[in-house]
Amino acid sequence: MDQQKIPQATAKRLPLYYRFIQNLSLSGKQRVSSAELSEAVKVDSATIRRDFSYFGALGKKGYGYNVNYLLSFFRETLDQDDITRVALIGVGNLGTAFLHYNFTKNNNTKIEMAFDVSEEKVGTEIGGIPVYHLDELEERLSNDIQVAILTVPATVAQAVADRLAETSVHGILNFTPARLNVSENIRIHHIDLAVELQTLVYFLKNYPQ
């Protein structure tokens, strides 16, 4: 099936499946059932089977799924052999944490540079990542950088996004409360930690387990 037709909800679950399958492979497990996958990733087995069905016959009834085959399949589907180079804009507490973490569990995703306006941070390295002045954004971003993580104050988020839109960046992971407006050729994922926490608290109060 053409991946353009895969539901976005399914696409968001693929990295979750891939990480668990990686762990299974490392443990030496040869096959896994949808029920086992369901228990591990907390997605019901019917949804897993439906997700997998978009890609054709990945398993056999009564046997389950071959772990090595799934690992190879999802590795190719998720382009795990292609390095995604990332720039981080805003080296505050959250940005600094990202630089130290630098997606150590994702061998194909690397933050390669960061930008800030603080004189104390510009010209230094954090987690081995060079920090440049925000004024150098357009100059420093090469065609290899296609994704940016935005951890700046909300008041300047739109202005920074406008500048990113004029570079090679095609995807923005926005950790600010601001809802950004950019051209259609740029994809934005908004992650508002305060909203996520409020949602969790709401579910805890209204949908007790």
UniProtKB/Swiss-Prot annotation:
One of its GO terms (cellular component) is cytoplasm. Signal peptide: none annotated. The keyword tRNA-binding does not apply. One of its GO terms (biological process) is negative regulation of DNA-templated transcription. SUPFAM superfamilies: NAD(P)-binding Rossmann-fold domains, Winged helix' DNA-binding domain. Pfam families: CoA_binding, Put_DNA-bind_N. The lineage of its organism: Bacteria, Bacillati, Bacillota, Bacilli, Bacillales. This is Redox-sensing transcriptional repressor Rex. It comes from the Bacteria. It is found in: Cytoplasm.
